[in-house]
């Protein structure tokens, strides 16, 4: 489509063009209602169908059984950092956290601020979070083990999740949910802000194993309890209808157009391999993550100088390649290549990188 750039922003991020076109086509008249999806009542059959179909597609894509429930919440993953220990870490118990970067650090600090007992079981801070720890010593009596599955700022990700035995894993999957198949049975809770890989900002998807709901203290305020959302099909109060609707279109695209998570993973690996090959064959670009910890979603890299990095980002945008500036906390460059990013976009970026190196190397 004319005037559309290749969008490598970290979040809010690219959405599939067919999804945007479907939104555009029915924006003024949703399913013959004579109203926009932003105008229909969340108590109507129109929205009932939206939320129920979205849940069903997520269940199918992730292979979730009847022992899981999909919730749509607000406040992003940052709110989950507090809600997880509030709901799922009983008094007198501790939880293991693995620290792999900025978002893990925030989750740890939030749990500690709640007065909870937190054990940092492993950390990659010793090398500036450029790797994922292995052989993590976990407490078999912990209430849960919390991980951040993909680290957007440093460009690292788990290839295999920790073996926690009978202790439930809890994962912030904001930046890699639905990017590959996973064994959901290992998890007590998966949560993800939608704005990176599932849809627009405004909704956080929480996938909770139903037995975990038994831990929720009755004394918590209603809007802070997972049970409130589970009991009311995420409609205790007015939900973020437009965001949920868009998530529904994205999971429909993954299921019907891409063909499921195995095909999505193959697509994502091809994109990442194409981009990482530049670092492995060049002295001009250097990746910041260890090879065995590289993310398929966020490719972080440096150039020989900050001046060159600024020129790279500016000239890339002039060539229709946007969002390549690294996170403000670390600098450098970053290409976020979430599910919607096309192989065509990756090839365009690689061609630009080769040309930029030729002129400036």
Swiss-Prot record:
The keyword Disulfide bond does not apply. InterPro entries: Aminotrans_V_dom (IPR000192), Pser_aminoTfrase (IPR022278), PyrdxlP-dep_Trfase (IPR015424), PyrdxlP-dep_Trfase_major (IPR015421), PyrdxlP-dep_Trfase_small (IPR015422). GO terms for biological process: L-serine biosynthetic process; pyridoxine biosynthetic process. It comes from the Bacteria. CDD domains: PSAT_like. GO terms for cellular component: cytoplasm. GO terms for molecular function: O-phospho-L-serine:2-oxoglutarate aminotransferase activity; pyridoxal phosphate binding. Keywords: Amino-acid biosynthesis, Aminotransferase, Cytoplasm, Pyridoxal phosphate, Pyridoxine biosynthesis, Serine biosynthesis, Transferase. Binds 1 pyridoxal phosphate per subunit. Signal peptide: none annotated. Pathway: Amino-acid biosynthesis; L-serine biosynthesis; L-serine from 3-phospho-D-glycerate: step 2/3; Cofactor biosynthesis; pyridoxine 5'-phosphate biosynthesis; pyridoxine 5'-phosphate from D-erythrose 4-phosphate: step 3/5. SUPFAM superfamilies: PLP-dependent transferases. Its EC number is 2.6.1.52. The modification N6-(pyridoxal phosphate)lysine is found at residue 196. Belongs to the class-V pyridoxal-phosphate-dependent aminotransferase family. SerC subfamily. Catalyzes the reversible conversion of 3-phosphohydroxypyruvate to phosphoserine and of 3-hydroxy-2-oxo-4-phosphonooxybutanoate to phosphohydroxythreonine. This is Phosphoserine aminotransferase. It comes from Desulfatibacillum aliphaticivorans.
């Amino acid at each position: 489509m004319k005037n559309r750039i290749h969008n490598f922003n970290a979040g809010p991020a690219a959405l599939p063009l067919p999804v945007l076109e479907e939104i555009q086509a029915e924006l003024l008249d949703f399913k013959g209602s004579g109203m926009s999806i932003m105008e229909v009542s969340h108590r109507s059959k129109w929205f009932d169908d939206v939320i129920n179909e979205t849940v069903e597609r997520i269940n199918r894509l992730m292979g979730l059984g009847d022992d899981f429930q999909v919730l749509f919440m607000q406040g992003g993953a940052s709110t989950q950092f507090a809600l997880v220990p509030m709901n799922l870490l009983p008094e007198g118990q501790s939880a293991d956290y693995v620290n792999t970067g900025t978002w893990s650090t925030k989750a740890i600090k939030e749990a500690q601020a709640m007065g909870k007992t937190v054990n940092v079981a492993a950390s990659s801070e010793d090398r500036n979070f450029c790797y994922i720890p292995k052989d993590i010593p976990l407490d078999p009596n912990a209430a849960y083990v919390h991980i951040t599955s993909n680290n957007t700022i440093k460009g690292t990700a788990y290839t295999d999740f920790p073996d926690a035995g009978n202790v439930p894993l809890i994962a912030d999957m904001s930046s890699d949910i639905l990017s590959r198949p996973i064994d959901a049975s290992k998890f007590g809770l998966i949560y993800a802000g939608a704005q990176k890989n599932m849809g627009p900002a405004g909704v956080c998807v929480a996938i909770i194993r139903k037995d975990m709901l038994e831990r929720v203290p009755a004394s918590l305020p209603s809007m802070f309890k997972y049970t409130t959302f589970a009991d009311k099909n995420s409609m205790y109060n007015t939900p973020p209808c437009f965001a949920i609707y868009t998530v529904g279109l994205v999971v429909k695209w993954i299921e019907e157009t891409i063909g499921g998570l195995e095909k999505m993973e193959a697509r994502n690996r091809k994109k990442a391999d194409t981009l990482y090959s530049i670092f492995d064959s060049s002295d001009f670009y250097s990746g910041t993550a260890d090879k065995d910890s590289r993310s398929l979603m966020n490719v972080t890299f440096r150039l020989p100088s900050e001046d060159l990095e600024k020129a790279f980002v500016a000239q890339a945008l002039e060539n229709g390649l946007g969002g390549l500036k690294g996170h403000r906390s670390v600098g450098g460059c970053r290409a976020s290549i979430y599910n919607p990013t096309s192989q065509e976009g990756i090839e365009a970026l690689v061609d630009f990188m080769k040309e930029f190196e030729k002129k400036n190397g």
